[in-house]
Amino acid sequence: MNYLPIFVDLKNRPVLVVGGGHVAVRKIYALLKADALVKVVAEKLHSSLQILVNEGKVEWLAKAFEASQVTSSYLVIAATDDNALNQQVFDTAESQQRLVNVVDDQPRCSYIFPSIIDRSPVQIAISSGGAAPVLIRLLREKLEALIPHNLGAMADIATRWRSAVKTQFPQLTQRRRFWEKLFTHQSFQRLTENHQIEQAEALVESELQNNNPVLGEVSLVGAGPGDAGLLTLKGLQTIQQADVVLYDALVSEAVLELVRRDADKVFVGKRAGKHSVKQDDTNQLLVKYAKQGKRVVRLKGGDPFVFGRGGEELEILKAENIPFSVVPGITAALGATAYAGIPLTHRDHAQTAMFITGHLKPDGNRLKWETLAQGNQTLVVYMGTIKAAELSAELQKHGKPSDTPVAIISNGTLPNQQVQTGVLSELAELAEKAPTPALIVIGEVVKLQKDLAWFGKEAVQFVSTQETLWQKPTLQNKETHWKQAA
């Protein structure tokens, strides 16, 4: 981030503008909207600027620039076509530690003006840091069409009723829930759109009098395999309404960035063999936060009902009579294989896809290896790298050919995604080299990966320790290139 987006209170603060042409006029109009005390230094004034001076809205300070004029200024703007003068203004402001903007000259700007969408008192600022002003203009045009014009009226009403709402709801969570309900109320939106402010305020009063106690709830949300673009629309809406988010180790940083800024984020991650938070502790946290009247999101990598223990958590909530909902996510078996170029089913190679986990309960049922070893199917193994040797041996023992194509996808759908391909007899060796989290894919469909890979750089081949019948094993990675001698 090259610039920190901030909003500055310029009311009754002196701002020096050096220049009196049409460029200066544009900046001055914006400054006057913020009630700044604008002082102009220019040899002559644009006709529009002269009118502002005559009306007493702008002070014509002097015709020539002097360093002393900067001393008493809160902000400085240089808007002339004289490069030497602009440089002088910039150097003077910098030496006096005053923020300065030389118009259309980014290297000589300690601050810049963003593009503004004005729904006062609601304002939205957009900037590319000077990198792509045309792109920002196009974006602003799209947002102007999308953002309703009644936002300002809604915000004004909220300002007038803030004190009454705070008295009625002393807890922050209660107030937040009230405002969210009001701002999404169709009648409130319609009344403000039609400028029926008195009726809109009557609705606020009615909602205050009839408001029910705030009830807590829990939403299990699938975060998807990693790429934030794969988070569902409903998932995005849910995490942006949350008061507290309990997230696991498989949720990507990009997805966490989409969580509402003032929500509490609680890490409850665990990995096979490396438990950092016990499942029972996570269950109790869900219950505790919900009973505090909070909107709780349990954010899980992939889909909460695919090896995510989501069902176990809902059973606890059901026993405690806590309302809950589930927002499905794109599971890793779907997302990671798609990004790796491996179709799970194909008429020529696989008519069945099976998902299994390599992390079973110690006293759990054994896997049905006879079924897993059958042909014409794709086997996807979650959390299987630490059991890769056993997986390979058991499948071969029960009839799976040793030259069956396999792939290990690490960090699927993320920029550092890595795909290794080989054959079943080499699975343990491949797993040792694979970063985690990783997904194992076993089946003839892996043959297609070389031709169908589209995400990241082209796969790099390496020499295997043994011959294969279909192709040499490959490693796909944006940054890594390794070879193993025969």
UniProtKB/Swiss-Prot annotation:
Modified residues (Phosphoserine): S128
Active site: D248, K270
Catalytic activity: uroporphyrinogen III + 2 S-adenosyl-L-methionine = precorrin-2 + 2 S-adenosyl-L-homocysteine + H(+); precorrin-2 + NAD(+) = sirohydrochlorin + NADH + 2 H(+); siroheme + 2 H(+) = sirohydrochlorin + Fe(2+)
Pathway annotation from the record: Cofactor biosynthesis; adenosylcobalamin biosynthesis; precorrin-2 from uroporphyrinogen III: step 1/1; Cofactor biosynthesis; adenosylcobalamin biosynthesis; sirohydrochlorin from precorrin-2: step 1/1; Porphyrin-containing compound metabolism; siroheme biosynthesis; precorrin-2 from uroporphyrinogen III: step 1/1; Porphyrin-containing compound metabolism; siroheme biosynthesis; siroheme from sirohydrochlorin: step 1/1
Binding locations of S-adenosyl-L-methionine: P225, G301, G302, D303, V306, T331, A332, M383, G412
Ranges for region Uroporphyrinogen-III C-methyltransferase: 216-486
Keyword NAD in record: yes
Single GO BP term: siroheme biosynthetic process
Family: In the N-terminal section; belongs to the precorrin-2 dehydrogenase / sirohydrochlorin ferrochelatase family. In the C-terminal section; belongs to the precorrin methyltransferase family.
Functional note: Then it catalyzes the NAD-dependent ring dehydrogenation of precorrin-2 to yield sirohydrochlorin. Finally, it catalyzes the ferrochelation of sirohydrochlorin to yield siroheme.
Protein name, entry field: Siroheme synthase
Organism for this UniProt entry: Actinobacillus pleuropneumoniae serotype 7 (strain AP76)
